[in-house]
Amino acid sequence: MLFASRPSCFKRLLIVEDDPLVAFDNERTLKHGGYDVIATVDSGEAAVAMLADKTIDALILDLKLAGHMTGREVARLARDRGVAVLLVTGQCPEDAGDIALACLTKPHGAAALLHAVRAVETMVCKHKMPRKVSGMQTYWRPEAA
């Protein structure tokens, strides 16, 4: 079964996505995968407010957002607060290692999103390189942990 509840060191996720259909699908997929999605927001400003007010373990973040803030700005703030960042965007930037652990390219399926989140979880919680995920670029390096 693809969607199953399982123990996780990531308890609370925040999704930042400006496309309503993608946001809905991502939220549903992650909730069915056993994650607690505390909110889904469409702008950097809303994301920063959630980061300031809530305990968040990981950020699922598009780089293109509604509002005036860029995804890179949000990722940098999240990283500075110790929040793991998985970029989910149309084209993964080569130079995002300073703001994210990995990037999943859109479009993606439900299984790819779950595998990508679990891969980031492996990096953060087990301090080891995860299995390769189709469509995902990894920035994290074990020696950096």
Provide a role label for each language-model segment:
Residues P20-A39:
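Two-component/phosphorelay signaling modules centered on CheY-like receiver
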Residues E17:
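Conserved acidic carboxylate
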Residues D62-L63:
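Active-site residues of response regulator receiver
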Residues M1-R12, G109-A145:
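Non-catalytic signal-transmission and effector/linker regions of two-component phosphorelay proteins
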Residues L2, E27, T40-A58:
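Acidic, metal-coordinating helix/loop segments flanking the phosphotransfer/catalytic sites
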Residues M69-V83:
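Short amphipathic alpha-helix used as the core "switch/output" element in two-component signaling
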